[in-house]
Structures are given as structure tokens and as C-alpha cells.
């Protein structure tokens, strides 16, 4: 079975790469993003829209309401193994995402060392200026999406349920938006009515938060097997 693994920090174009590869190969993409398992966080977690998918198939490790919390890495890893097994007859699958905890679960498990041909695309963290330009563009799109709710609309809706607030405070983007509202002494719904100057500050702040997260991801990712090449058979992270 061919497994195409696309991973790297946030805001480095992994989803775009995965969609292009799916168009080329006809294979489905399985997201390795634990936050994307919550449809209520579609925009803020970076779930691509139907239009962005361009006719390709994208799968998720779970479909759960936020009140159940973000799926744990071990559970996500178990679901990942199940999905790979379910698609074995199709001959291949594209795995795409940046969950360091999930990727490290893979690195520690011998399951991935047998019967797979690996094709690995590792997106690296660019310099800060390049990253911030891409991140700001992404955040602006999240604030004004072509389809669906904006990240702020998602936040406002979920904020109305107090028990969800601690979960939101653990997720990049939503966390900074809540901090921004607090610092400026405004309510969450007032974030929907920001002038251009204030919105620019919000965009920059969220992008900065993404950059901090991306640097942390880069430090926590498991190392790709030094012996790996395109079509390599063995453990992708060289642990076994």
C-alpha cells in the first residue's frame, strides 16, 4: 500500500499540496489534524471548503461536537490505523497534517514499519517574514471566507455556551481573538464589527500566534528516517 505523508508546521501549504496530489493520483486525503475533527471549528481549524477541495475526497479521524473536547492523540492514532486498514484495498492514501502528538504516536508504533511504501513530503518552517505574509493572508480569509462562517462567527456562537470556553482557549486563533477582545474591553460579538485598523491588529496578532505555534511544532516533529526515499519500505520515522 502506498502512503503519501505530507506534514509540517501550520500555515505552510500542506492542504494545498495534499489537494494537488489527490487530483493527480485520485487518492483520498486523510487529515492528521485533531482540531479539524470538530466541524463547529471548520474555518478556524483550516478545514478546506467544498470549492477548495476541487472534487477531491477529504476524510477526518472523527466527527464530534466541541463539547466532547478535542480527540486525544492516542485515540486519533487508533482511528488512523483503522482508516488505513479500511483503505488498504484501494492501494493508497494521502495523510496530511501537523499534529505533533499524533505524528509522535506514529513514530513510537511499529505498525508503520511494515507493508507500506512511503512517499514523504516535509514542509519546513520558512523565515518569519515569509511565514507572516502567508499567515496574515490565511487569517484574512478566515475572517472573510467565501463560504461558511468566519472564525469570529464560530467563536461568537460557541462562546454562548460557557462550558466550551476553556476548550476554545486552548486552540490557536480562537485563543488570541478572545484575548484581543479582553484587552480591548469588548465582547466577543463586537469582534464582528471591527474597523479596518482594529481588524488589522487582530489579523497580525493571530498570525503571530500561529508563528509561535509553528516554531513549537518544528521542534516537536519526529525526524524522518534518514534512509527514507520515495517509495521507501520501512518505518517513516526510523524508530523501528
Curated annotation (Swiss-Prot):
It catalyses: dimethylallyl diphosphate + AMP = N(6)-(dimethylallyl)adenosine 5'-phosphate + diphosphate. The keyword Protein biosynthesis does not apply. The gene is izt. GO terms for biological process: cytokinin biosynthetic process. Belongs to the isopentenyl transferase family. It comes from Agrobacterium tumefaciens (strain Ach5). This is Adenylate dimethylallyltransferase. Transfers dimethylallyl groups to AMP as part of the biosynthesis of cytokinin phytohormones. The keyword Disulfide bond does not apply. Disulfide bonds: none annotated. Its EC number is 2.5.1.27. It holds the Pfam family IPT. InterPro entries: P-loop_NTPase, Tzs. It is an enzyme of class 2 (transferase). It comes from the Bacteria. Keywords: Crown gall tumor, Cytokinin biosynthesis, Plasmid, Transferase. One of its GO terms (molecular function) is AMP dimethylallyltransferase activity.
Amino acid at each position: 500500500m502506498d502512503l503519501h505523508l505530507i506534514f509540517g508546521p501550520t500555515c505552510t501549504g500542506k492542504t494545498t499540496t495534499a489537494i494537488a496530489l489527490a487530483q493527480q493520483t485520485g487518492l483520498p486525503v486523510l487529515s492528521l489534524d485533531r482540531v479539524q475533527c470538530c466541524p463547529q471549528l471548520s474555518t478556524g481549524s483550516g478545514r478546506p471548503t467544498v470549492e477548495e477541495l476541487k472534487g477531491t475526497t477529504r476524510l477526518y479521524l472523527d466527527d464530534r461536537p466541541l463539547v466532547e473536547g478535542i480527540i486525544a492523540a492516542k485515540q486519533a492514532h487508533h482511528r488512523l490505523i483503522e482508516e488505513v486498514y479500511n483503505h488498504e484495498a484501494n492501494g493508497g492514501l494521502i495523510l496530511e497534517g501537523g499534529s505533533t502528538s499524533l505524528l509522535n504516536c506514529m513514530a513510537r508504533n511499529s505498525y508503520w514499519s511494515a507493508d507500506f511504501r512511503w512517499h514523504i513530503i516535509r514542509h519546513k518552517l520558512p523565515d518569519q517574514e515569509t511565514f507572516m505574509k502567508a499567515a496574515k493572508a490565511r487569517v484574512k480569509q478566515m475572517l472573510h471566507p467565501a463560504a461558511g462562517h468566519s472564525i469570529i462567527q464560530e467563536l461568537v456562537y460557541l462562546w454562548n455556551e460557557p462550558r466550551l470556553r476553556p476548550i476554545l482557549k486552548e486552540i490557536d486563533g480562537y485563543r488570541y481573538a478572545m484575548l484581543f477582545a479582553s484587552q480591548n474591553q469588548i465582547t466577543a460579538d463586537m469582534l464582528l464589527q471591527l474597523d479596518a485598523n482594529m481588524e488589522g491588529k487582530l489579523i497580525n496578532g493571530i498570525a503571530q500566534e500561529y508563528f509561535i505555534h509553528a516554531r513549537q511544532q518544528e521542534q516537536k516533529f519526529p525526524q524522518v528516517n534518514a534512509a527514507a526515499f520515495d517509495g521507501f519500505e520501512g518505518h517513516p520515522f526510523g524508530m523501528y
